[in-house]
């Protein structure tokens, strides 16, 4: 399909459409020159541009006057200066001439058809009489036309042909067009519109007015839809541009078919054309494409995602356009007197083609740039979060490897495409230069079919004086002299219009030559030339953007040392039951590799910058001898994996047990470049955790698998059971009420008065605005929402509440807080303020605090589910009444008796921590993130369950999310990295998933407690043969029936 090509080769498609549109524009412009322009003519005349037209003084014109010869009964034509006329006399006749090849077999009557009713001399058939004269290889055809200098008839110009237009243009170039002329033209246009409207009936006005209103509503609706989809201007403009192109193509097709539609009729049809093409279809296509590209795997090529989205969106769009085209074609065929039906059908055909070609190509480039910008935003966020430039670039490229590659490849396609266009341009010019000797042959070919206007400068300069001397005008002057009803007429010889004979369409060179001539003619127009400059400027901007993408893509990480590859090939993971050890294998490999040099030799080589020549054992010696700092191995060796292996060996040999070097803690096959300057220091390996998955859990109508990294048996299974029960009721519904991360510095003042004044200023609108401006200037992503203050003696605690997009954002907030405090001290008059700490525990971070429970921190989410009573019995093995009673007694009363703050739940921290470890969140923040209150109610025999979590602190950028395993789990949830269209949506979605998962865990654990199955399930799922001593059969049976027997003796249980 065409959309696949447009998505894969967008730049080529745009270039091809641009060429075709330019050709259609030429045809459209040629058609406009044949239309009536009373408004334009009157506006030109108003400013003197057409004064005396066609008697406007033009170059090379001559004025002749018939005078009597003294003493003789005869008269002669004398040339007189134009100034002698003085505006009082008048010119009776204009002699207009056409020059064309002498042997061209054409019907020259077509040249003067517009002047059929104005000619002075007619032949027997009523057509204009020509006066012919051969001049070399050219034929001069002349006619006589009446003209009045004082009052040139405007109606004479309304049927203006290209001949008249060619004479208007020099006058316009000479006088210029000012702003006042444009205002006059607008005013004249408005007056002419009112005149046309006054001649129409009320029904016609109502129909056209309604159509224009609907058109404006459609355009505004399209703009608003594109705004909601994340495009402020360009996609909206592209849709309108595509529609304009379709109208141009349709007009060209209609005129080629012989159907003439006047300019006034086209203006009346414009709103119907806009309404016919259905702009909302373009918005729907855009929505589906953006949705597909937002939720798809970011590593898949962009053009594949767009092609799939277009394939899904195509059927309804094709049905709409097909129905409209068929109906309009039938009406056009039936010929009901409305010839615009043919135009409407043509517009719909071309609009459908351009929608899936030109617009899809524009949309592809837009999304390519958006994906690249998203990757660049990730890199900048990671830098603000404290990562180094190289690590941030590596992580951003790894998160979306296809973006840079695609943008880079797109740049190279642009580069080669530009070279091809430049080559074609040079070839056309060379062809133009080389074809000059053959133009005369082309113009005089016997196969010529019609005449076309030529550029006069390319042909011999025929001057009126020379033609007069050659007797070219003798016949026409004699005919004028013989007319009996005039005395002493004046005649003006106007400069001629040159025509060449067009060759037959079978000549390829003629076609190319004609195209070049037309192109050069129209390209010189001031309007088109300005658009070409704008297009070239836009092209340069796009090329610069893609050049930056290609440059970033060309930056490659330094390849790993060969010694690491050797070690990886030799060292394998060996189970603990094997008698061999990794240490023995490594020592054997080092011994085989080379002989260990003395410490003095190693120090000399190291000081001389030859560290790369040392083997691992020699580097270990240097490190043990304190010549290389343990933390600097990555920087010195330029090889992160080798540095980890050596550090592991050094630590093992320096420790008391000396077991680390030969332990089963893994070290190889891990991307430590993502860890360096990002997650951990002094790395000696990595710690695998069991990773399970619960679900799928339906959250807000979408299924999610919940990744959980934990070492606690029965936790994943319990959460899985809760997911099953929640899904039985239709899934979970979540509401996010707040999204704000906080940092609370502590500042001090000399006395309470100054501290109180600072608090009042910070709480005022002025103070809030100053601090917000200072804070927001430090980051492209962090935005200060509001400030809360608390005073304790002379110490002032300030809580900055900010939004941080998809990042958890603690580091970028700290940078903004520092700068805001500096501005407060230097510019707000609080130079006596002392900053005690950027974090004064008023945040509060990684500590239980009532302020997080009340005001929230991070994302505040409430999740709810309705579990049918039957599902409670069949899945959870308990009853609704028992669950509600247990929740009140345990989670509410029990936590209150313990004086808990935010701990009104069964085990929210269990689920939060497991999900945090799996998705790369900060595990320490489970302290405040686990704030949760679980509520249960019996509603018509069903269980209404909800969890409210006011301080879920999560992010999808930075921290542990840069690691590949954790990033893979974010990919599983579809929330990795920054959201393409709405920053912050990915982290907010992750918070919703956490809340829903906590609700599933709460439901399952409370059910196990209510039914007395907790101990039994843990014994069954939390005992493994590897770490549990053998038991006899009598000991394996849990004694949970004792609880049932106790409860059974209670009345009502």
UniProtKB/Swiss-Prot annotation:
The keyword Secreted does not apply. InterPro entries: HMG_CoA_Rdtase, HMG_CoA_Rdtase_cat_sf, HMG_CoA_Rdtase_CS, HMG_CoA_Rdtase_eu_arc, HMG_CoA_Rdtase_N, HMG_CoA_Rdtase_NAD(P)-bd_sf, HMG_CoA_Rdtase_sub-bd_dom_sf, HMGCR/SNAP/NPC1-like_SSD. One of its GO terms (biological process) is isopentenyl diphosphate biosynthetic process, mevalonate pathway. CDD domains: HMG-CoA_reductase_classI. NADP(+) binds at residues 779-781, 806-814, 1022-1023. The modification Phosphoserine is found at residue 1024. It is a multi-pass membrane protein. Its EC number is 1.1.1.34. Its main location: endoplasmic reticulum. The keyword Lipid biosynthesis applies. Glycans are attached at residues 137, 518. PROSITE patterns: HMG_COA_REDUCTASE_1 (PS00066), HMG_COA_REDUCTASE_2 (PS00318), HMG_COA_REDUCTASE_4 (PS50065), SSD (PS50156). Residues 204-365 form the SSD domain. Part of the first module of ergosterol biosynthesis pathway that includes the early steps of the pathway, conserved across all eukaryotes, and which results in the formation of mevalonate from acetyl-coenzyme A (acetyl-CoA). Hmg1 catalyzes the reduction of hydroxymethylglutaryl-CoA (HMG-CoA) to mevalonate. The first module starts with the action of the cytosolic acetyl-CoA acetyltransferase eg10 that catalyzes the formation of acetoacetyl-CoA. The hydroxymethylglutaryl-CoA synthases erg13 then condenses acetyl-CoA with acetoacetyl-CoA to form HMG-CoA. This is 3-hydroxy-3-methylglutaryl-coenzyme A reductase.
């Amino acid at each position: 399909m065409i959309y696949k090509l447009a998505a894969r080769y967008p730049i080529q498609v745009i270039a091809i459409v641009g060429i075709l549109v330019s050709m259609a524009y030429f045809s459209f412009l040629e058609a406009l020159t044949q239309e009536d322009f009373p408004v334009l003519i009157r506006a030109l005349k108003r400013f003197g541009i057409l004064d005396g037209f066609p008697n406007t003084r033009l170059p090379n014109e001559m004025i002749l006057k018939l005078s009597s010869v003294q003493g003789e009964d005869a008269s002669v034509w004398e040339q007189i200066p134009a100034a002698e006329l003085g505006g009082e006399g008048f010119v009776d006749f204009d002699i207009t001439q056409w020059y064309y090849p002498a042997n061209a077999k054409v019907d020259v009557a077509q040249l003067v058809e517009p002047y059929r009713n104005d000619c002075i001399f007619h032949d027997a058939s009523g057509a204009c009489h020509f006066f012919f004269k051969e001049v070399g290889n050219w034929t001069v055809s002349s006619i006589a036309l009446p003209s009045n200098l004082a009052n040139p008839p405007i109606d004479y110009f309304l049927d203006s042909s290209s001949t008249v237009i060619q004479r208007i243009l020099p006058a316009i170039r000479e006088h210029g067009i000012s702003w006042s002329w444009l205002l006059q033209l607008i005013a004249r246009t408005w007056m002419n519109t009112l005149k046309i409207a006054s001649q129409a009936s009320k029904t016609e006005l109502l129909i056209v007015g309604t159509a224009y209103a609907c058109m404006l509503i459609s355009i505004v609706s399209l703009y608003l839809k594109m705004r909601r989809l994340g495009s402020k201007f360009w996609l909206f403009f592209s849709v309108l541009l595509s529609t304009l192109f379709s109208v141009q193509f349709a007009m060209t097709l209609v005129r080629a078919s012989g159907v003439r539609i006047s300019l006034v009729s086209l203006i009346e049809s414009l709103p119907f054309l806009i309404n016919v093409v259905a702009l909302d279809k373009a918005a729907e296509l855009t929505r589906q494409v953006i949705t597909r590209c937002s939720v798809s795997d970011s590593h898949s090529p962009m053009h594949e995602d767009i092609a799939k989205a277009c394939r899904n969106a195509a059927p309804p769009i094709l049905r709409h356009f097909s129905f409209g085209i068929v109906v309009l074609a039938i009406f056009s065929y039936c010929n009901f007197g409305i010839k615009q039906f043919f135009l409407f059908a043509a517009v719909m055909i071309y609009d459908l083609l351009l929608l899936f070609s030109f617009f899809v190509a524009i949309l592809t480039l837009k999304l390519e740039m958006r994906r690249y910008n998203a990757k660049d935003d990730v890199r900048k966020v990671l830098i603000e979060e404290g990562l180094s430039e190289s690590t941030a670039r590596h992580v951003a490229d790894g998160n979306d490897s296809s973006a840079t590659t695609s943008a880079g490849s797109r740049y190279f396609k642009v580069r080669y495409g530009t070279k091809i266009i430049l080559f074609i341009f040079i070839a056309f010019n060379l062809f133009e230069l080389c074809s000059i000797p053959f133009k005369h042959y082309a113009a005089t070919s016997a196969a010529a079919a019609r005449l076309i206007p030529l550029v006069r400068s390319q042909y011999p300069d025929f001057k009126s004086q020379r033609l007069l001397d050659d007797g070219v005008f003798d016949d026409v002057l004699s005919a004028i002299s013989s007319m009996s009803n005039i005395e002493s007429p004046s005649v003006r010889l106007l400069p001629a219009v040159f025509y060449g004979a067009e060759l037959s369409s079978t000549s390829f060179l003629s076609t190319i030559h004609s195209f070049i001539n037309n192109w050069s003619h129209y390209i010189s127009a001031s309007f088109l030339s300005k658009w070409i400059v704008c297009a070239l400027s836009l092209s340069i901007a796009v090329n610069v953007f893609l050049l930056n993408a290609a440059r970033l893509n060309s930056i490659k990480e330094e390849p790993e040392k060969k010694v690491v590859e050797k070690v990886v090939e030799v060292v394998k993971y060996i189970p603990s039951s094997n008698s061999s050890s990794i240490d023995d294998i490594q020592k054997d490999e080092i011994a085989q590799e080379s002989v260990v040099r003395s410490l003095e030799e190693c120090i000399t080589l190291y000081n001389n910058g030859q560290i790369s020549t040392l083997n691992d054992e020699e580097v270990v010696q240097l490190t043990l001898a304190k010549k290389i700092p343990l933390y600097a191995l990555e920087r010195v060796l330029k090889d992160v994996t080798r540095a980890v292996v050596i550090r592991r060996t050094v630590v093992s040999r320096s420790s008391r047990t000396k077991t680390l070097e030969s332990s089963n803690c893994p070290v190889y096959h891990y991307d430590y470049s993502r860890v360096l300057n990002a997650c951990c220091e002094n790395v000696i390996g990595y710690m695998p955790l069991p990773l399970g998955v619960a679900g799928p859990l339906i959250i807000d109508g979408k299924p999610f698998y919940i990744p959980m990294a934990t070492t606690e048996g029965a936790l994943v299974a319990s959460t899985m059971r809760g997911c099953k029960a929640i899904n039985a009721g239709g899934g979970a519904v979540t509401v996010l009420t707040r999204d704000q991360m906080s940092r609370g510095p502590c500042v001090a003042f000399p006395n309470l008065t100054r501290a109180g004044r600072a608090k009042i200023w910070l709480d005022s609108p002025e103070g809030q605005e100053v601090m917000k401006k200072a804070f927001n200037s430090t980051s492209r992503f962090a935005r200060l929402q509001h400030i809360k203050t608390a005073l304790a003696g002379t110490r002032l605690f300030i809580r900055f509440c900010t939004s941080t997009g998809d990042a958890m954002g603690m580091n970028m907030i700290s940078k903004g807080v520092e700068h805001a405090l500096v501005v407060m001290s230097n510019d707000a008059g609080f130079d006596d303020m002392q900053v005690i700490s950027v974090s004064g525990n008023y945040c509060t971070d990684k500590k239980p605090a009532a302020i997080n429970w009340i005001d929230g921190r991070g994302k505040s989410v409430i999740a709810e589910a309705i579990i049918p009573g039957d599902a409670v019995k069949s899945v959870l093995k308990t009853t609704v009444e028992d669950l509600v009673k247990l929740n009140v007694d345990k989670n509410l009363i029990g936590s209150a008796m313990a004086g808990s703050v935010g701990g009104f739940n069964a085990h929210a921290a269990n689920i939060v921590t497991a999900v945090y470890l799996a998705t790369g969140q900060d595990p320490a923040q489970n302290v405040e993130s686990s704030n949760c209150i679980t509520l249960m109610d019996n509603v018509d025999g069903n269980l209404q369950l909800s969890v409210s979590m006011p301080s879920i602190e999560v992010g999808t950028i930075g921290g542990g999310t840069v690691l590949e395993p954790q990033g893979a789990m974010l990919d599983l949830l579809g929330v990795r990295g920054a959201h393409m269209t709405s920053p912050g949506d990915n982290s907010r979605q992750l918070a919703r998933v956490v809340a829903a998962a906590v609700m599933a865990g709460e439901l399952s654990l409370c059910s196990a407690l209510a039914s007395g199955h907790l101990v039994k399930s843990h014994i069954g799922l939390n005992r493994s043969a590897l770490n549990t001593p053998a038991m006899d059969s009598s000991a394996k049976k849990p004694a949970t029936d004792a609880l049932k027997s106790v409860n059974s003796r209670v009345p009502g249980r």
